[in-house]
């Protein structure tokens, strides 16, 4: 009888010890619960990171479109600038040609005036010779030659004067064109500045896109890590849950057996 009592008491003590182990295990699980909840929160945050990645990808597409637009605008400005440079070169060449023509006409005018001056004295003498023709006996042939030369010089002088007038008009037109070309040159310089600004903006966009690509790569890597950690956390939770279920079931069966034996 005493032996049966001692056996029953041992079984009760064993059951009490098993219950203590169960309570200790439950307490341990309660301590692990915050860590598991954090892992679950990471799983929920995964969707937020997906949205961030989507927004960044959308930003890449918009940046690419803007980059193409800036490149098209840059090409257009470069074509306009080349056209203006070609026009400016053409006007500069015409200016140089006109300068040569002006110098030639000025030289011709100077030569004509020089010849006219040289003939002024003989012409004065010619008038005197007309009055005293019989006394001086100047040959009529020489007089005719001098008068013919004088007429030729007058015609040449009129031609040079007409050329000078026309040249002055052309020079005025050219000055107006030159003024217009200065404005064109200023516009060309402004286009060059716009081109430089566009090139800087394109460079900044490319740098931004490169940095964004690095950031996207990091986000994708972080997303993969989160996915893996979330999967591991879920698997661990399922494994712990199955182990706890099996252990609890085993302990419950053992406890039922012990209670039956006590009775």
UniProtKB/Swiss-Prot annotation:
Keywords noted in UniProt: Coiled coil
Name of the protein in its database record: Putative ankyrin repeat domain-containing protein 20A12 pseudogene
UniProt keyword annotation of Coiled coil present: yes
Organism of origin: Homo sapiens
Pfam (any one): CCDC144C
Biological classification of the source: Eukaryota, Metazoa, Chordata, Craniata, Vertebrata
Positions in coiled-coil regions: 65-121, 171-263
PANTHER family according to UniProt: ANKYRIN REPEAT DOMAIN 36-RELATED (PTHR24147), ANKYRIN REPEAT DOMAIN-CONTAINING PROTEIN 20A1-RELATED (PTHR24147:SF1)
Residue ranges of the TM segments: none
Keyword RNA-binding annotated: no
Domain of life: Eukaryota
């Amino acid at each position: 009888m005493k032996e049966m009592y001692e056996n029953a008491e041992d079984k009760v003590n064993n059951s009490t010890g098993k219950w203590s182990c169960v309570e200790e295990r439950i307490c341990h699980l309660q301590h692990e619960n915050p860590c598991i909840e954090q892992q679950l929160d990471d799983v929920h945050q995964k969707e937020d990171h997906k949205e961030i990645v989507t927004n960044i990808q959308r930003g890449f597409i918009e940046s690419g479109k803007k980059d193409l637009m800036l490149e098209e605008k840059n090409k257009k400005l470069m074509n306009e600038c080349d056209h203006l440079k070609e026009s400016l070169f053409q006007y500069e060449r015409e200016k140089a040609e006109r300068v040569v023509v002006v110098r030639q006409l000025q030289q011709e005018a100077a030569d004509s005036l020089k010849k006219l001056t040289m003939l002024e004295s003989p012409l004065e003498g010619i008038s005197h010779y007309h009055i005293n023709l019989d006394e001086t006996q100047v040959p009529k042939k020489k007089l005719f030659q001098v008068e013919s030369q004088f007429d030729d010089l007058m015609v040449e002088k009129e031609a040079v004067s007409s050329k000078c007038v026309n040249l002055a008009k052309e020079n005025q037109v050219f000055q107006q064109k030159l003024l217009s070309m200065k404005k064109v040159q200023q516009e060309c310089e402004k286009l060059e500045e716009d081109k430089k600004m566009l090139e800087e903006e394109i460079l900044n966009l490319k740098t931004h896109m490169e940095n964004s690509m690095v950031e996207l790569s990091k986000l994708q890597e972080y997303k993969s890590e989160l996915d893996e950690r979330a999967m591991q956390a879920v698997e661990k939770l399922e494994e712990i849950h199955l182990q706890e279920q099996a252990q609890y079931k085993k302990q419950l069966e053992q406890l039922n057996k012990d209670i039956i034996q006590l009775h």
